[in-house]
């Protein structure tokens, strides 16, 4: 039994790392064991260093949010208010959990008779109960400030060292002498740090503000991590670094817009969101296909020719480009409403979500009048990174996470 299991695992491992699938013709994994120059060639063992680094990044994040982001939030006027617990009531709790969080008028009257409470009191109970589950604005601001800081720093680092790389200016050099392209120190740090950050996102999902797209984002992060790992082991790190940098370009603007929203700076929020939309569309609908897809599809075909994993990576990049087009359409819709109304309105991509300090009176009234209201629309994710900006009570509301990074990197959408 043990021998059969070992043989099965051996076959599975051999299939997973099949040279005929992952590498060009006449290239073997043994060929990439040589030292090369600098940090040598990418190896699977290098990926192991990602896990302690991910823990370090996660720890730095906790310290950053506690000692830097929180004081900044308080300074811009965000309150550190405790969540007020609603009066316990088993009957209403059962309805809230199992039936609806937004009872209609008929149900309210029935509960009123059953509990001998006024309809108004029951309305207030449900409103406070909803707010009890919603994250404080302070928490969301701190999360966005951390992501803003990381995205800005990693983008600056990436563009600084890529600027001096010949393959940044001539993408054909991503494929000359492939896969015998040794790692530089800067490229090694850049790739491993990015991969570690995505692993830290996996950890933090379980303590971050819970979104309706939790499962989707979990799967999205897993796929992004797998693709980024494979691209590293496969030594597609040059073009992978270009994709990283391009996807990092717009993310700081989104997080900045969300912070402005949480701080109730509506005009600044709208301005930043419109700038973000322009940056996203230019980078994803113009630069990505003309710069990235051109080199991965045509230049690589001419220089090294196709092989099985080449088709896989390009298929994923084409799917990513389709998502870019969909996301851009939704961003244009939201930006158009922002410009016409003077503020960011409901983002069709995102969950509508208020903090525990805010009350959703408009949604509540719509329910009582029989209109349908939703606590969210489909979220927008991507990359390889996601973003959710919404309007509640006529104010600029930023919610969710825009991780266009899922496979930026060959991701995830904060």
Swiss-Prot record:
Lumenal side: 1-43
Effect caused by changing residue 140 to R: Does not affect ceramide synthase activity
Region (Homeobox-like) location: 75-136
Tissue-wise expression: Ubiquitously expressed, with highest levels in testis and kidney. Expressed in pulmonary epithelia.
Motif (Last loop motif) on chain: 299-309
Record function comment: Ceramide synthase that catalyzes the transfer of the acyl chain from acyl-CoA to a sphingoid base, with high selectivity toward palmitoyl-CoA (hexadecanoyl-CoA; C16:0-CoA). Can use other acyl donors, but with less efficiency. N-acylates sphinganine and sphingosine bases to form dihydroceramides and ceramides in de novo synthesis and salvage pathways, respectively. Plays a role in de novo ceramide synthesis and surfactant homeostasis in pulmonary epithelia.
EC number(s) stated in the UniProt entry for this protein: 2.3.1.291, 2.3.1.24
Protein name: Ceramide synthase 5
Cytoplasmic-facing ranges: 333-414
PANTHER family in UniProt: CERAMIDE SYNTHASE 5, LONGEVITY ASSURANCE FACTOR 1 LAG1
Compartment annotation: Endoplasmic reticulum membrane
Transmembrane segments: 44-64, 148-168, 187-207, 214-234, 272-292, 312-332
Membrane topology: Multi-pass membrane protein
